[in-house]
Amino acid sequence: MEKLLIIGFLILASWSDIKRREISTSLIIVFGIIGIVLFFIQNRQSFYSLMCGLLIGVLVILLSCITHGEIGIGDGLILIDTGVYLGGFMNLELLIGGLLLSALFSCLVFIFKKNIKQEIPFVPFLLISYLILEIL
C-alpha cells in the first residue's frame, strides 16, 4: 500500500512540477501526515531511520537557501515526505538516482538543444528513480 501511495504522490507532484513549476503545499502536508500516521501504526522502521530520511530533505532545503533558490525548496519538502515512508538509506538512494537521471537529461539537453540556462523540474526524476528502485 505504501508503494502505491508513494507512486501516486510522486505522479501528482511531478505533474504539478512540470506544469506549474511548484508543488501543492496541501499535497505535501497531507502525504506527510499520512506517512507519520502509518509510521506509528506499522512500526516498520526505526525512529533513527525516519529521522535520517527527514534529514535528507532538510539538507536539500538548506542547499536551496544557500543557492538562493537554484534548487527548489519544494524538492526538499518532497524528500522530507518520502523520507517518512522510505527511511534514510532508501531516501538517499532516491535522491542520488534522481540526481543521476537529471544530470543525464541535462547532458542530453545540452548536446541537442544547446540551451544551458533551461530550468528542469526535478520531481519527475525522483518518480523515475523510485520506479527503478522498486524494479531492482
Enumerate the predicted regions with their spans.
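A membrane-topology feature that recognizes alpha-helical transmembrane segments
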Residues: 1-136
